[in-house]
C-alpha cells in the first residue's frame, strides 16, 4: 500500500509503531548492522544513535518508549531529547559527544544541521523530510570521521568507524525532495570559465 504523507506521519506517531521500530532496531543493531567479530554486543554501549522526530511531542514519546525498549526506564542519561525546550541544548549536545552513558539523542531539527557529533554511528528517521538541503544536512550528521581511540573513549566496544547506518522507518530515502528557490533577494548568476 502507498501511504500519503498524512497517513505516514500518523503511523509514526502511534506509540505501537514507535515501539515496533525501536524493537526492530534493537534486535538488528548487533545481528545485522554492527556484527563484526571484534565488536562485542553490549546494549549499554549501543552505537551512538540520533533519532529524527516529527515534533516535540513525538520526540517526548520516542524517549519514553525507547527507555522501555532498551531497558533504561529509570535512567535519564541513556536516551535524551535535544530540542529547543530541553534546557541547555549546547550542553546536551556536548554530553552526547563525550558521555559514554548517553547513547540515543532524539531531536526534531536542532541537531539536524551544523552540529558535529563524530562518534555518531546511526541515524534513525522517524519523520519524513521534504527539503533536499535539510535532508542532506541531516544525513551529514553521520559522515563525520573519528579516530579509533577517540571512538572507543565514548563507545568502548567499538573498533573503528568505517561507515554509518541510516535507518529509514518512514520512506525518507525513497522519494524526491524539494529544493525551494530563494525569494525576495538578489538573483544569483553563475559564471564558469
Can you say where each PLM-predicted feature lies in the sequence?
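Short helix-terminating capping/connector loops at secondary-structure junctions
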Residues: 35-46, 73-77, 158-161
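Structural motif corresponding to the C-terminal cap of alpha-helices
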Residues: 25-36, 70, 96-109
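Long, largely alpha-helical accessory region at the distal end of helicase-like NTP-driven motors
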Residues: 4-10, 20, 24, 170-193
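Conserved RecA-like P-loop NTPase helicase motor core
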Residues: 74-182
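Interdomain helical connector at the RecA1-RecA2 junction of SF1/SF2 helicase-like NTPases
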Residues: 1-46
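Pre-Walker A (Motif I) flank of P-loop NTPase domains
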Residues: 45-48, 102
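Hydrophobic alpha-helical scaffolding
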Residues: 7, 11-14, 52, 56, ...
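Conserved helicase motor "Helicase C" RecA-like lobe of SF1/SF2 P-loop NTPases
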Residues: 31, 43, 53-81
